[in-house]
């Protein structure tokens, strides 16, 4: 799950978003998004679907996105 938390940060950084902006874009708070980035909790299936749609990425992209992208 380490990859997922880093990749969420990378997706957010590519757009120049704050955690609050990223969270709001997928229907959660910035606090929740931050917990995902830190690996404290993880998005559920519905939230992953929202991330896929908002960021135009697949589940595999979320998991395997190259961390050098940031």
What are these regions (language model features)?
Residues 1, 10-16, 24, 31, ...:
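Short, charged recognition helix plus adjacent turn
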Residues 27-43:
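Recognition helix of helix-turn-helix/homeodomain-like DNA-binding domains
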